[in-house]
Amino acid sequence: MKIQKIIVFVMSVGYCLCANSQIVSISPNPQSVEWSEESFKKPETIKLVGDKSADIDALNLIKHNFSVSDKGLKLVIGEREDSSVKPYLKYIPDKEEGYYLKVSNDVIVVAGNDVAGTFYGVQTLLQLMQNESFYCVTVSDYPDVLQRGVVEGFYGNPWSHTDRLRQFDFYGKNKLNVYIYGPKDDPYHREYWRKEYPEDKAKEIAQLAEVASRNKVHFVWAMHPGQDIKWNEEDRKSSLNKLESMYKLGVRSFAVFFDDIFGEEQSKADGQADYLNFLQREFVEKHHDVAPLIMCPTEYNKGWAGKTYLPLLGDRLDKNIHIMWTGNSVVDMINDGDMDWINQRIDRKAYIWLNYPVNDYCIDHLLMGPTYGNDKTIASKVGGFVSNPMEYAEASKVSLYSIADYTWNMEQYDENKSWENAMKNLMSDHYEAFRVFCEHNIDLGANGHGLRRDGESPNLRIFIDELEGKNGLAYNKLLLDSINKEFDRMIESADELLSSNSEPELLSEIKPWLKVMKLIGQRVKLLIDMYEALNDKDEKRFVDDYESSIKLEQEQKGIISRNFEGSIKKPNPAVASEVVSPFITRTVRYLIRLYKENYTYRTDIFPVEVLEGGKYYIKCNGMWLTNANADANRVGDFPVWKKEKDMINPQRQEWIVSMEALTGRYKIVNAQDGRFLTDGGAFRVSENVKYDNELHSFDIYRINGKYAIVTTSKAGGMIFTADDSGIKAEKSDGLNEKL
């Protein structure tokens, strides 16, 4: 039975606890914790007992964090078979990676059921010791899910070598034990899967495997041969050679991916099963220290599942090989019924690949909210559970902290408490400011996979809903003052974090979003002053505020994340898009309408907006305009027409259309890589060809229920037309005839 217990005693007169003692939050949430009434003060030194046989990585943690001497508080450490912990055998959970921890004023005991358990017991001890004093405590603990962690499987800029090393330290502290290396943009994982890594990259892989092992993380190297593999002896030999080369680098866990492939032969279950069984026999079973294979199938979600592929794979594939699964769709949370459905078909427990908080399909958003939606009853039904993170490694830790909580102790998982603890853990010096930032970066916005997250901008939502609901945006001094204060918090929080020297790796990643958050706050404060100007009948102030807000909006649109040479994706950050951005749009429209009703206005300042700014699909004859060769650094290619919606990289078919206030024309940008259309309909921009609003912006006309896109007069006044391959610019005489 799982216990979360506090023992409370009635104190006699004259006896009291140390005023500074406390009950400490432990992460992940342990299976059983018993706090006593006795206060414990962090010792200056400790005396090790059992250090001759205990796990070396656990001992190194102890020695790195404590002074060791023969006169210190006794700390007994070891694994189940060690003589040092024999007196405590009955207390050690008989579970893989389990541990028993006792902290008292007489002795500290860290007793693991195995080496990982000892290591995790020390990690819990170190969390406690971050406090100078706390109540004495006994912990009996083990994980619900034996394989839990992260799969680096997103499309975009892969994590750096330093990112990965920092991740392993984080995983060790939070008891995550799996990292699957599968970055889509590593050619030696994908295109060059047959070739060995060059020497410099091989050294990096070896270091990753070593550092992961020190943190009790299984470094799983994934191979993605599905694009072009042949089911022949030559490719079988190439596969063995590649795996052997990785083994020599220290890798002891392997995965093979057949996801997101389109070759008919490569997608067949029988070919995949025979190939993987060969690798299991000829490689895994011939190395005593290699873990069972993990494979990602071609039909990795229910929405793509046919009638025969999964049952055939489950029947023919060696039962020791794990099969990955993303749920009902590519991006989905996992429930109990999902597990019953898939486990029955593959004749084993599915290995969950959770596509959250990955944001490669909504790259302008950071997903910093609570991690929720997965059932808390599936622990016994999963063979493993890994999260696909964002390309922003440090920002991903908000969610990964909760993934660790969830997979360790599923029934007691509290998404909101875990979220709060994650923010405090990652940004303890600026928790309140960081919380404000996270609150405004929760939802994904409209996206091709349909996943949305509730709870963004919660305080503002209350006031905005009241302003719009009761008054239809009409002037209300009290509500506008309340809204104004919330945007003051937004600006102040952004300033606090932008000026901080704490957690530089995290702040560097989120800096573009912090800048956007501040600008949004400043823009809304100008909108509120525009309300006041209309109320005061001050036309000049209204126009001045509006023009100032346009300048801030243009500055906001110019902020780019990952804007470095070679970057694969360069998003313009979106912040508070669920509540605040629509509020800004509606309020600007409302205020301009009121202004026009009362004053003679200039059309150069207040142009007519034919199409509201936002993300759009561009369709013609039932086909979707697609950025097929998305690459932020590619030049000279054209978008093409596709008959099907892109369900793997939906942003290839999403186009960000925005009006430039200074010209009254529209800019058209692809959401996948941030490249914009030029006057000829191509992606011809490069680092040496900057955006030119006289050449690269468009007039948009609505005629006969359709839209026409026309280049500027400087670019020839051409209209975009469609042919079989894509779009091209032609003379714009006779718009009606061309539509």
Where in the sequence are the language-model features?
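Active-site groove signature of glycoside hydrolases
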Residues: 242-268, 291-300
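Acidic, His- and aromatic-enriched active-site or binding-groove loops in soluble protein domains
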Residues: 200, 204-205, 242-251, 273-275, ...
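Acidic, contiguous N-terminal accessory segments
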Residues: 19-105, 131-139
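Lectin-like carbohydrate-binding module/patch detector with strong preference for beta-trefoil
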Residues: 602-739
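Substrate-binding groove of N-acetylhexosamine-processing glycoside hydrolases
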Residues: 26-29, 34-35, 278-304, 310-605
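Bacterial Sec-dependent N-terminal signal peptides
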Residues: 1-25
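Short, acidic/polar
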Residues: 159-170, 235-245, 309, 335, ...
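Feature activates predominantly on carbohydrate-active enzymes
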Residues: 89, 93-235, 248-252, 285
